[in-house]
Amino acid sequence: MVAHPHPLFGGTLDNKVVQTIARAFVSQSIVVLRPNFRGVEKSTGAHDHGMGEVDDLWAAWKWLIEKFPGVRGKRWMGGFSFGAVMATHIAQQWSTHSIAAGQPGLDRVILVGLGIAPDRRPAADLGPTARLIHGELDEVVALKTVLDWAAPQRHPILVMPAAGHFFHGQLPFLKDCILRCLHD
């Protein structure tokens, strides 16, 4: 599953970073779903400031597991910007539910350009399966902001030199970084 950037700023399942994450997953023979959040393109509903969007992802996971029973093997979640923040909530809730049900959690969570902002729903704390990738020159969410957020959790961040928020001209390098994070 790969979650897209903020719907109110043009984020859709067709975003190039979302597609790059999805392609990295597909290259590892993982079934991938890139759903649009509510109110985006042909999706019903309206933006819900991160609350309903997490519900959207849960519904998509449920559909994916029912449609492709084999997905019960490896479960990878990815997200870009706002989608990465939503992915943190899925990962945290999945961990809580899976522990209670005696089921495995997500195998890997890839968070690219984590879109944390003081006026939005905060990102959830991360578990050990999460990997963060952030551009050194991110002009939307400063690297220092993400470092400050990750420090109390002692969570490492893979920093892509000279990369901005949208990784212009660096998608092949981003895909390589994602693949490294999937297998470290």
Model-derived features with residue positions:
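Short alpha-helix in the alpha/beta-hydrolase fold that links the catalytic acid
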Residues: 128, 141-150
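Acidic catalytic loop of the alpha/beta-hydrolase fold
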Residues: 136-141, 165-166
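Gly/Ala-rich beta-loop-alpha elbow adjacent to hydrolase catalytic centers
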Residues: 78-87
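Catalytic histidine-centered segment of alpha/beta-hydrolase-like enzymes
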Residues: 45, 163-175
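Short glycine-rich catalytic loops that host catalytic nucleophiles or stabilize transition states
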Residues: 38, 158-164
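Short beta-strand/loop motif that positions the catalytic acidic residue
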Residues: 126-127, 131-134, 138
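Serine-hydrolase catalytic machinery in alpha/beta-hydrolase-like enzymes
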Residues: 1-70
